[in-house]
UniProtKB/Swiss-Prot annotation:
Subunit details: Monomer.
Cofactor(s) of this protein: [4Fe-4S] cluster
KW 4Fe-4S (keyword) present: yes
Cellular localization per UniProt: Cytoplasm
The protein's name in its UniProt record: tRNA-2-methylthio-N(6)-dimethylallyladenosine synthase
Major location (coarse): cytoplasm
Annotated [4Fe-4S] cluster 2 binding sites: C186, C190, C193
Pfam families (UniProt xref): Radical_SAM, UPF0004
Database matches in Gene3D superfamilies: Methylthiotransferase, N-terminal domain, tm_1862 like domain
Sequence ranges assigned to domain MTTase N-terminal in this UniProt record: 29-149
Source species: Bifidobacterium longum subsp. infantis (strain ATCC 15697 / DSM 20088 / JCM 1222 / NCTC 11817 / S12)
Reactions catalysed: N(6)-dimethylallyladenosine(37) in tRNA + (sulfur carrier)-SH + AH2 + 2 S-adenosyl-L-methionine = 2-methylsulfanyl-N(6)-dimethylallyladenosine(37) in tRNA + (sulfur carrier)-H + 5'-deoxyadenosine + L-methionine + A + S-adenosyl-L-homocysteine + 2 H(+)
Gene that encodes it: miaB
An example Gene Ontology CC term for this record: cytosol
Length: 484
């Protein structure tokens, strides 16, 4: 959700950097982190930044990034898609072009691809200074020091998690929205997924530690928190408490000043009525849900080792919407999984028609090395592309129809940014309403202009293909009000 992220310049302007006066304005070096992948990687990048700042490094401003006036570039990689390696090596190659004009530039590579390809990275890209994994973020400053001292690439990737990344210092990318990890890793064995290999088995944090972190975020100005985990609703299963996640959601409702709570991602097999009730009954839990379907074919779901079937999936959706009629539910769908027939694909299309997702992250299947599905017989690319195009067209139609239902309604939007370089002249702001839909707002003449983090109740005047527009006419009785 890039709209609620601060720029590097904003982050640099508010960072409490106690080391600058001791080390000079560049500290041990000016750094920039380039993040690929999911929300967990964004969370980890905040920890990487926090560890670096705690060790005397200084975050780059936008001007420094644009001018390549950098001492350290960090790439936090993703391994989920087939082109992950291509993206990683392509980015490392671009970093090397910067190093050619800044010979003292250090380049560090971390994240899931580093966890998988640690040695290959150092061999293929000898200009890389350090390689570190998902489980030893805290080692990065030491590796950089060793590289400076020896001139040799430092590769250190651990298989055992020594401490939760959430226990490390954080340089949060947003003043108002915070990522809070409740677990790391995954115990599922989906045949297409590389995450258990890169992140390991699921480990849950203590609920008290999670709630303490949330309170700290709120004390620092956060108004919204997103709880993160590969499978959030199996939280607590390891200690035998199958109600731990719903208890955590309800506990979030007791935190003063916490306006909005979201979470991602749940697994349909573990999504239970107590979680639905907690969402419906806790005022600051938003009625937004990312609910991965992957396929509407029971045969393909079995081949994927997804421990639910389409009927159960739709039944859960029905219970969610009965409890929360306004719920906006998005999903993930893989097209072209090995062995998928046209009949299987049509079953997916049927489920999409019934589910009426607010949006869908739709992917062409890509084999990941070492996963069971990679060894299965693959489907011709042209067949998969045709199916993909048909599914995207169907979902876009449903999305547009869903957004159209917002026209004329009043929604409360948390402001997360300004629109365009001339926003101070046009007074256009952007944010998300309670169920996560992006809303672009035109501030009526003479009305107060909201700041980032303010809440605006406004009448939606137009639905776009992927967002809503609100250009209210206050004189005609349409709504516009700001809450700080």
């Amino acid at each position: 959700m890039n709209e609620d992220m601060m720029t590097e310049a904003e982050r640099a302007s508010i960072a409490a950097d106690g080391t600058d006066s001791l080390l000079g304005e560049r500290g041990k070096g000016v750094f920039h982190i380039h993040t690929l992948g999911c929300q967990m990687n964004v969370h980890d990048s905040e920890r990487i930044a926090g560890v670096l700042e705690a060790n005397g490094y200084v975050p780059a401003t936008e001007d420094q990034i644009n001018d390549n006036d950098l001492d350290l570039l960090v790439l936090n990689t993703c391994a989920v898609r087939e082109n992950a390696a291509e993206r990683m090596y392509g980015t490392i190659g671009r970093f090397n072009r910067v190093k050619l004009v800044r010979p003292n530039l250090q380049i560090a590579v971390g994240g899931c691809m580093a966890q998988l390809d640690r040695k290959k990275i150092a061999d293929t890209a000898p200009w890389v200074s350090a390689v570190f994994g998902t489980k030893n973020i805290e080692d990065l400053p030491k590796l950089l020091d060793q590289n400076r001292a020896t001139g040799k690439a430092q590769v250190q990737v651990t298989e055992q998690l020594r401490q939760f990344p959430s226990q490390l210092p954080a340089a949060r990318a947003s003043r108002i929205s915070s990522w809070v990890a409740i677990s790391v890793g995954c115990n599922n064995t989906c045949t297409f997924c590389i995450v258990p290999t890169t992140r390991g088995k699921e480990k849950d944090r203590r609920p008290g530690d999670i709630l303490d972190e949330i309170r700290q975020c709120v004390a620092g100005g956060a108004k919204e928190v997103t709880l993160l985990g590969q499978n959030v609703n199996s939280f607590g299963y390891g200690i035998g408490d199958r109600y731990a996640f719903s208890k955590l959601l309800r506990a979030c409702g007791t935190i003063d000043g916490l306006e909005r709570v979201r979470f991602t991602s749940p697994h349909p097999a573990a999504f239970t009525d107590d979680v639905i009730a907690a969402m419906a009954e806790t005022p600051n839990i938003m009625h937004q849900l990312h609910f991965p379907l992957q396929s509407g074919s029971d045969r393909i779901l079995r081949a994927m080792r997804r421990s639910y079937r389409s009927a159960k999936f739709l039944d859960i959706l029905g219970r969610i919407r009965e409890a929360m009629p306004d719920a906006q539910i998005s999903t993930d769908i893989i097209v072209g999984f090995p062995g998928e027939t046209e009949e299987d694909f049509q079953q997916t299309m049927d489920v999409v028609r019934q589910a009426r997702f607010s949006s869908a992250f739709t992917f062409i299947y890509s084999p990941r090395p070492g996963t069971p599905a990679a060894a299965m017989e693959q489907i011709p690319r042209d067949v998969v592309q045709d199916r993909f195009d048909r599914l995207v067209a169907l979902q876009e139609q449903i999305t547009e129809e869903n957004l159209a239902t917002f026209e004329g309604r009043d929604v409360e939007v948390m402001i997360t940014g300004k629109l365009g370089k001339k926003d101070t002249d046009t007074h256009r702001v952007t944010g998300r309403e309670k169920t996560g839909v992006l809303v672009h707002i035109g501030v009526p003449e003479g009305e107060p202009v909201p700041e980032i983090g303010d809440f605006v109740t406004v009448t939606v005047t137009h639905a776009g293909r992927h967002n809503l527009l609100a250009d209210p006419d206050v004189a005609a009785g349409q709504t516009y009000s700001v809450r700080h």
